[in-house]
Amino acid sequence: MVNLLSCLLLFLLSLHCFVACLAVNTKNITTDQSALLAFKSLITSDPYDILSKNWSTSSFVCNWVGVTCDERHGRVHSLILRNMSLKGIVSPNLGNLSFFVILDIKNNSFGGQFPIEVCRLRRLKVLHISYNKFEGGIPAALGDLSQLQYLYLGANNFTGFIPESIGNLQWLKELDTSNNRLSGPIPQTISNMSSLEVLKLFSNYFSGSGGGGGEEEDEEEK
């Protein structure tokens, strides 16, 4: 009888833990869904109706076009929306996607300033926003993305300096700031980036030795 009671209590405790974990996961994925819906709400042109028809609360967020979820945690892992002719600004709510690893919106028409809130995503490894219309300065807070390995900012309208904090990205393998309107000296802190393999800085207005330099490649843009 005692053993039966112990087993029953253990079962109830396990059931309670399961329900509690399920509730937490549901709340977290709802947070991710809300962040992506906020992103969608700031898109002013979706000529192929990709998001307007697919991104809906009637379907599971992990099944949305361009969205991938992490199998282990069940959270939004990546957003890849390249070459879709989307126009608008990027919602700061993307900074709530705490399990985000990849943000790739290459070759669209996103504009305005890039939201500093994205720099809260400490798991981010790939940030690809080339071939858009972003303007203003490159956020110094990008230097807080300690896991970042690939940073592509090329072919936008960024102005000002490359922030010194860029040198904090110890795991960065590729950096592209080409074809912008950046000026001033190239920060010496770039030499601290021990993992850097590809550096593209050309077609800017840098001053001093090496301005507009970097390794230029003939291969197709990534």
What do the PLM-derived regions correspond to, one by one?
Residues 1-222:
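Plant-biased, solvent-exposed loop and capping regions
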